Structure formats: C-alpha cells, structure tokens
C-alpha cells in the first residue's frame, strides 16, 4: 500500500506512472478508487474547507495505491467529506 498527498491530480502523467507496469515484470499498482468505483469521478480531497483564494477549485490529490494481491481484498474506498481538521479530507479503504 502506498498512500498520501501526491500533490497531483488524476489527470497528471505522474498518476499514470504510478499505475504503469514495472520494467522488471512486477505487476503494476492499482488506484484503489478506480478499483472500487470504476468510471466514477474522484470526489474532492483538497480545498473543501480551506481555500488559499476565494474561488480556488476543489481537487482530488490524495490517493491510495494497492498491489495486485490486495485488490481482491478491497471492500470499500470512501472520502470523508465532513472532517475539518486539515486542508485535506481523509481517504479510507476497507480491506478484508
């Protein structure tokens, strides 16, 4: 599992690099949101309650990447949009 604030959006080429195959044949990582919610847009995780400038757009820049072996164990991925203790919203995965 690799998780955190990556300071990039889903459309950034670096996100594509995170889920690209490894040169040595190791299976690629998977974005947990994409696994749990295929085709569903990412909810915002940044600038919901704290904006540097009025009108700053909300962004999704917090990701959880899973190894191939963990993907079948993924049960849920949610963004807690109510918490106001940081400028980022928690992204929570449930594995079983």
Name each region found by the language model:
Residues 4-6, 89:
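Active-site metal-binding loops of divalent metal-dependent hydrolases
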Residues 1:
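Hydrophobic "anchor" residues on beta-strands that sit immediately upstream
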Residues 72-82, 90:
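Low-complexity, intrinsically disordered Gly/Pro/Thr-rich segments
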Residues 34-35, 79, 95:
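Active-site donor-binding loop signature of nucleotide-sugar glycosyltransferases
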Residues 86:
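Short glycine/threonine-rich catalytic loop with a Thr-x-Gly-x-Asp
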Residues 8-72, 83:
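Active site of divalent-metal-dependent phosphoester/diester hydrolases
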Residues 64-66, 92-96:
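Short, well-ordered beta-strand micro-motif
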């Amino acid at each position: 599992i690799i998780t955190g604030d990556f300071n990039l959006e889903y459309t950034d080429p670096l996100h594509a690099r995170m889920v690209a195959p490894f040169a040595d044949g190791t299976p690629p990582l998977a974005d947990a949101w994409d696994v749990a919610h295929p085709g569903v847009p990412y909810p915002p995780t940044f600038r919901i309650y704290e904006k540097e400038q009025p009108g700053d757009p909300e962004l999704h820049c917090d990701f959880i990447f899973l190894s191939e072996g963990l993907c079948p164990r993924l049960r849920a991925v949610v963004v807690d949009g109510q918490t106001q203790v940081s400028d980022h919203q928690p992204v929570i995965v449930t594995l079983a």
